[in-house]
Amino acid sequence: MMWWFLLIGLASAAATASSASSASFESRCQHFHKEIHLQNVHVLSTTYVPIGSNIPMVYNPPICGGTASSSISTIQFCQVALNVTTSDKSQFFMEAWLPSNYTGRFLSTGNGGLNGCVSYADMVYATQYGFATIGTNNGHFGDTGQYFLNNPEVIEDFAYRALHTGTVVGKALTKLFYPQGYKNSYYLGCSTGGRQGWKSIQRFPDDFDGVVAGAPAINFVNLCSWGSRFLKITGPPGSETFVTSAQWSAVHNEILRQCDALDGAVDGIIEDTDLCQPVFETLLCNSTAVDKTSCLTGVQANTVNEVFSAMYGLDGKWLYPRMQPGSELAASFIYYSGNGFKYSDDWYKYVVYNDSNWDHSTWTLADAAAAAAQDPFQISSFDGNISGFQKAGGKVLHYHGLEDAIITSDSSKAYYKHVADTMGLSPSELDHFYRLFPISGMGHCSPGTGAASIGQGSSTYAGDDPQDNVLMAIVQWVEKGIAPEYVRGSKMSRDGTIDYRRKHCKYPKRNRYVGPGKYTDENAWKCV
């Protein structure tokens, strides 16, 4: 089968590990701290975690979920907790999990939002595959920007330094713990984690051989401004510009009415949002309408049109793409609720203006210009020249959900075009090292209405076959040279079984229903 190389790697690792008993592995772990003498690294603990035990998360603070995020270990591993000093005003916390079923592969996980919290779920997922796995708190604990206030060192950790330094430390620990060192290094992250992956590609092209970057928060500063812009468009609840959640439901139904069948199948899922250019004047209330919850006033129709339009600066230059249609049910509670967006608010309060009293209702495009002019430590992570990564032989699998209600998938398509234009490469030339997969029916880093479980984490596991598992797909691409032509997603039922599967096309191709089977038949679709 296609994933034979993974199983061989696991079997080989198991054979190596079995030469030493669990007792010797436990002893090795408990004494490992004596071998760690790395600059600016303070070892907090080394803990042996046996199979079937609760994974200790004693350093995970309540603001990050505390011990509530604990899970049962399916393997035995050595858990190393450390603090790493990055300046006289900053440090980050990290953990390295070193499994007994080690496959010779190193992996770093990313973060989300403005956190601040180790991605323990991703660490569990990767470690069970035999990766020596690390995760950091990205320079501060908690999903908040308050630690950025008047502290550029903490911002630098968040922008790139915690991940890069953690990777350097993690690789050193891996070499210390395993005599054979590591063969290949990988990265797995989504959202902020996706941005971190791209920042590593752009600034540290030798850090990873393979990167899985999902729904990346690239063009980060303008993304923050885009999040602030929605309040300006919608106004507060009760204003004539405000659209209620019930009306957004009507908007969603109208979008599906106009766009669902464009891919050839009426299944409640939009396969290519680029083709979806809805007209909302069809929802205008007539003079006799009694129920105004399912129609729009002219002012409200203008609000909806603005929501689905790109953001341009005071000078008329493009800043950020439109929100893709199809995400409005979730986005109505995130961006269109008539309140500020937390991450955008925090960025302006604690970074742009260093003023915790800044009022999000005052935001204008002048603020967007001020924020963009700063772009501290190039956190926007939108550099189109990734030739260093290309020359290093790196591979990146980039995915983005087409129902993402937090970061529009149009941003990923814009970055793909930016890379192509900057490097002067065609899609077939980019294919050698960079492939983008828009995933229909996927929300923000997680399943939505469609076949969107693609193995990016434990909660979206649908098998070990590389076509069903993006982590295994990047391993196969790096180690066997077999690049993914598609990513097959699974629609999971509540009991954990698979309802149906669908192959998601490599951009810029799009999925088209051609029959003759039902839309749930993966072979009834074709990439065109």
Swiss-Prot record:
Glycans are attached at residues 83, 101, 286, 354, 385. GO terms for molecular function: feruloyl esterase activity; metal ion binding. It catalyses: feruloyl-polysaccharide + H2O = ferulate + polysaccharide. Involved in degradation of plant cell walls. Hydrolyzes the feruloyl-arabinose ester bond in arabinoxylans as well as the feruloyl-galactose and feruloyl-arabinose ester bonds in pectin. It is an enzyme of class 3 (hydrolase). Belongs to the tannase family. It is found in: Secreted. One of its GO terms (cellular component) is extracellular region. This is Probable feruloyl esterase B-1. It holds the Pfam family Tannase. InterPro entries: AB_hydrolase_fold, Tannase/feruloyl_esterase. The active site is at residues 191, 404, 444. Residues 1-19 form the signal peptide. Its EC number is 3.1.1.73. It comes from Aspergillus fumigatus (strain CBS 144.89 / FGSC A1163 / CEA10). SUPFAM superfamilies: alpha/beta-Hydrolases. Ca(2+) binds at residues 260, 263, 265, 267, 269. Disulfide bonds join 29-78, 64-117, 190-445, 259-276, 285-295, 505-527. GO terms for biological process: xylan catabolic process.
